[in-house]
Amino acid sequence: LLIGRNFDFYVGDEFAKNKLVEFIEPENGIPYLSVSWPGMIGVVSGMNKEGITVTINAGKSKIPLTAKTPISFVTREILQYATTIDEAIAIAKKRKVFVSESILVGSANDKNAVIIEVSPDNFGVYRVENSSKVFCTNHFQSEAYKNDKRNQKQIVESHSEYRYEKLQELLQEN
């Protein structure tokens, strides 16, 4: 199982220089590592000792007007407590979030990867059948979001679909 991601969250050169890898040994749960930056609480990319990986990609959201669970806390909880994809899905499903995100979850135990798609009003899981590849950019792919107007707009108006197609092209070449 090979999981890759580009870290294209860019807010200036100084920010780009200050990445760090944290090794966390919590009092409860599974030790994990996280690729982050100083001051960040939670996880945007990481892997736990049981072989669960998480990476997040932002989807199209409306401006949040209420506080709920930050997505980086959800992904941290997945790394700290999940040993399988089903456990990761259960953790994500029990949390209410205030933004839309795709959480790519890989599992050494399951020898598989899925995309958990969360938003304030919906939840979906994208599984690829009969394929060794799953691609995740900045739009949702599960049946739960098939008719979602915000997601359809994201596909048409953003660079997400282009990035998805480019990923397919590059992996086909190599």
Regions found by a protein language model. Name each.
Residues 2, 6-174:
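C-terminal, well-structured catalytic/ligand-binding subdomain of enzymes
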